[in-house]
Structures are given as C-alpha cells and as structure tokens.
C-alpha cells in the first residue's frame, strides 16, 4: 500500500512538474520563437544533423500555405479547442482493431504540442500528455500564433525545420518565391519528410493524394 501511495505521489509530482514547465514555456513562446524543440533534440540523438530553423512572422507566411495546411491536417482548426474527441475516438477504434497504435487523430495544436515538448513514438501515454499540452497551448496562445509556430517548427526534410528552411532545402529558394504547385508539393510531404521529398512524393500514394487534393482545391 505504501509503495502504491508513493507511486501515485511520484506520478502526480511528475505531471505537475511537466505541465508547469509547459505552461511557463508556452507563455514565453507566445512572444519568442523556441530556439530548440523536443523533436530537434530527438533527431540529434538519432544522429541527424539538425539545421537551424528560420522562423517567419505569421504575416510573411504565404496565405495559401496557411490555408492549405489547415485543409490537409485539421479542417476544424479554427473552431476546436485543441483536441477533437471525435477524431481521437475514431483513431482509438482503428488502433484497437489493428492491435497497435497506427492512427493518432491529432489536431494541428496536438502536433505542435508533440513537436515542442514530447517524443515522436506512438504511445497512449504520449497521446494523453499531448492532449493536455494542447489544451494549455490553446489557452495561452492565439490561433494565429499556434499556426505560426506549427509551420515554423515542423520537419520538412532530415533535420530541416520550418517552412522557410524547408522551402530552401527542397527548392533552393524562400517560401515566398514558391508558386501554388510548389507549395502544394511542399505541404504534401510533411507526413514523412525524411523518406520522401518534393521530387519523390509520387512514390507514396498518400502524399500523391494530398498533392492532387491541393491542386484541385
């Protein structure tokens, strides 16, 4: 009984420390871009050479890029509060049927929470922390800031983070110089930017579908 009590207290203490740290950092990130994210650290530990992100202000990110990422990743981004219970339920049912975690059902806010603070493995513990973290992000940040941080810190190539660095890596020029076709290719590959590039996305059926969805949007 004493062991169980100590375990509960330890767990509560760890959660309090984690969410407290997330709250403080999120308040800072409301005004300052994070110099490093959890995903960057994980990639470094995997031996990937991480390149510095090149953050862009929200107003300088092409309008099509912002609208397209919401269209592809999170249709209800502007109306939900960080977590979509329906999507989580569907993902849970699919995972139970498969016998393993295959789908995440994550919103853009949850993906940002994972990239900033958590680890990339598909685990129910991480999903629970991700949901709680997303609620903090939605409480302390505006939707514009969440989308800005997301686009500036997701991976767009091996160790390449942010839409500006991703554009330079994939096309050799800044994102504001890209046309709609190039932006569609760039955003189509974010499901697996380590294995695929804008030149090889046709080798992946899902990425090809995402690309043509944007081109016909």
Predicted regions and their residues:
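Juxtamembrane regions of bacterial inner-membrane/periplasmic proteins
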Residues: 2-217
């Amino acid at each position: 009984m004493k062991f169980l009590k100590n375990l509960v207290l330890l767990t509560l203490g760890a959660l309090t420390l984690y969410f407290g740290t997330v709250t403080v950092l999120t308040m800072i990130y409301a005004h300052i871009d994070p110099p490093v994210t959890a995903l960057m650290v994980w990639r470094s530990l995997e031996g990937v050479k991480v390149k510095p992100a090149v953050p862009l202000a929200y107003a300088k990110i092409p309008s099509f890029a912002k609208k397209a990422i919401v269209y592809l990743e999170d249709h209800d981004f502007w109306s939900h509060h960080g977590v979509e219970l329906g999507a989580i339920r569907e993902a849970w049912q699919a995972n139970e049927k498969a016998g393993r975690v295959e789908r995440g059902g994550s919103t853009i806010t949850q993906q940002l929470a994972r990239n900033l603070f958590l680890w990339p493995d598909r685990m129910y513990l991480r999903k629970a922390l991700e949901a709680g973290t997303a609620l903090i992000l939605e409480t302390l940040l505006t939707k514009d800031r969440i989308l800005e941080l997301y686009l500036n810190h997701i991976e767009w190539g091996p160790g390449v983070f942010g839409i500006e660095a991703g554009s330079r890596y994939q096309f050799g020029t800044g994102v504001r110089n890209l046309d709609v076709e190039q932006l569609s290719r760039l955003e189509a590959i974010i499901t697996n930017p380590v294995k695929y590039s804008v030149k090889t996305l046709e080798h992946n059926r899902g990425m090809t579908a995402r690309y043509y969805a944007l081109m016909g949007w």
